Design a protein with these regions (language model features):
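Short glycine-/acidic-enriched loop or helix-start segments at secondary-structure transitions
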Residues: 15-16, 36-38, 71-73, 99, ...
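Short, conserved loop/helix-junction motifs that constitute active-site signature segments
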Residues: 18-20, 51-56, 79-82, 129-131, ...
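Acidic, histidine-bearing metal-coordination/catalytic regions of metal-dependent phosphoesterases
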Residues: 1-13, 218, 224-225
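Active-site neighborhood of phospho(di)ester-bond hydrolases with catalytic His/Asp-centered motifs
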Residues: 5-7, 25-30, 59-65, 87-90, ...
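Binuclear metal-dependent hydrolase catalytic cores centered on His/Asp/Glu-rich metal-binding motifs
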Residues: 98-135, 153-166
Length: 225
């Protein structure tokens, strides 16, 4: 199975180049921008209209922190499913024998959607990701995996979630997919990473760069399983 992983399109989805020969496309969140859910809703619906028309048999969407209209249920799971899109929110799906888990949650940072305090995330992951699977899709990265950014004092930091990293290293799925942390200044987060001594490939599918919205700086990642 050939998979196209994309994330953080932030309304620029129509700038993507659609690769050939893809069996499954997975978008790991942030198709939209506005914090206000009523302003956010039209952007998510515009994305759905584009996503449903992709010439790819299987399509998965996992929401991100900018997708406030989904958190508030102005856009629902049924809205995705009625358009042939699988929406995952702390649940599994199996496609052609490949078992996939998806969750929108990220560590708290401001007042955005699907965010939880880091102290609560470990319990959430352990309860939600309770079965072995081939692919884990979460909006945000595990700690130390394509997750670098700058804090308010311009110091580089690793923004990912440690409890998610621990769980992934315990379970070792074939792939761990995420976005959320974009390329930033001289930091390249988009791409793939494999940690020494472990089998899992980590994929940051974000396609934009902070401070350079309006164009794409990545076209996502191609995976095979």
């Amino acid at each position: 199975m050939k998979i196209w992983h994309i994330s953080d399109t932030h309304t620029y989805h129509d700038l993507l180049t659609i690769p050939n020969g893809i069996d499954l496309v997975i978008h790991s969140g942030d198709c939209s921008n506005p914090r206000d859910p009523y302003n956010n809703e039209p952007e998510v619906r515009d994305f759905i209209d584009w996503y449903k028309e992709l010439p790819i048999k299987n399509k998965i969407y996992v929401a991100g922190n900018h997708d406030t209209s989904i958190e508030k249920r102005l856009v629902t799971k049924k809205d995705f499913e009625d358009n042939g899109i699988i929406y995952l929110e702390n649940e599994y799906v199996t496609i052609d024998g490949i078992k996939i888990f998806g969750s929108p949650h990220t560590p708290q940072f401001g007042q955005w959607a699907f965010m939880k305090e880091r102290t609560k995330l470990e319990r959430l992951w352990r309860l939600a990701i309770h079965e072995p699977c081939d692919i884990i899709v979460v909006h945000g990265p595990p700690k130390g995996c394509l997750d670098k950014s700058y804090d308010r004092n311009n110091n580089m930091e690793s923004c990912g979630d440690k409890s998610l990293l621990n769980l992934v290293l315990d379970m070792q799925p074939v792939y761990m997919l995420f976005g959320h942390i974009h390329n930033c200044k001289d930091i390249i987060n988009a791409g793939m990473l494999k940690l020494s001594g472990y089998d899992t490939w980590f994929s940051n599918g974000s396609v934009v760069t902070d401070g350079k919205f309006g164009k794409l700086t990545s076209n996502g990642n191609i995976l095979e399983i």
